[in-house]
Amino acid sequence: MSKAREIRTKIASIKNTQKITRAMELVAASKMRKAQDRMAMSRPYASKIRKVISHVAASHAEYPHPYLQQRENIKRVGYIIVTTDRGLCGGLNVNLFRTAIADMKKWQADNIGMDLCVIGRKGEAFFRRYGGNVLAVADHLGDAPEVQDIIGIVKVMLDQYDKQQIDAIYIATNEFVNTMVQKPLVRQLLPLKTDEEEVEGGYWDYIYEPDESKDLLEMLLVRYIESQVYQAVIENIACEQSARMVAMKNATENAGQLIDELRLIYNKARQAGITREIAEIVAGAAAVE
């Protein structure tokens, strides 16, 4: 019966693990809904500021802002990598790393260097092992970060761009499609392309007084980049919680299946033990007779 006791101990251990994964699933589901709400609230701001930039830039076409001008000879590029601080979220980070590295290899093939700014401890650990030139790291942002938390890392990258140390800035992050699907992607932040269709067909119900739109454009462009990075961080948190919820749900279900299998093995072992004991009793009784 020692084997049956061992199986019973395993079942008890797996049940305890199942309780933990179930609790983590519920916590992740609650955090995911909150992250989705924050993501939805931040999107209109980013969309509106992009339209205003297009309008202001079009009104001063004679003033080509460096953030709107494509540089001819690209010698070095920068990447802002948005990852998580914690694990247990399936392949969320791994898939992002693969997408980012695939994009980076295109530049490496042309002998173009890269600088990285990383958000999240998982990304920092990976790219330091990978050998990337990590300029700055932002971690421990929590589940509800503020814009101020990412301003520092954005400033590092913009300073590099202003000094012409890098000629383009990209951001690698996860896009929230739905609860089951998170899509890793890399998109360009700078130089920024203005929305020409919005400028040509849009209706503007405001004017600028005094006419300091050049300074306004400078400020708006910086705020826009900050809003894009912040939006990416918020969206990545929603992706993280969704992926963790699904991973913990799968772990809970797998634990249940394993418990059922162990119970079947336990019952067979217990039955075999009882049968053996009965056989021994019968054999002993027969020997006495």
Curated annotation (Swiss-Prot):
Membrane-topology annotation of the record: Peripheral membrane protein
Main localization of the protein described in the UniProt heading: membrane
Molecular function per GO: ATP binding; proton-transporting ATP synthase activity, rotational mechanism
A single GO cellular-component term on record: proton-transporting ATP synthase complex
Pfam family of the protein (one): ATP-synt
UniProt KW keywords: ATP synthesis, Cell inner membrane, Cell membrane, CF(1), Hydrogen ion transport, Ion transport, Membrane, Transport
PANTHER family: ATP SYNTHASE GAMMA CHAIN, ATP SYNTHASE SUBUNIT GAMMA, MITOCHONDRIAL
Record note on quaternary structure: F-type ATPases have 2 components, CF(1) - the catalytic core - and CF(0) - the membrane proton channel. CF(1) has five subunits: alpha(3), beta(3), gamma(1), delta(1), epsilon(1). CF(0) has three main subunits: a, b and c.
Protein name in UniProt: ATP synthase gamma chain
Organism: Coxiella burnetii (strain RSA 493 / Nine Mile phase I)
Gene that encodes the chain: atpG
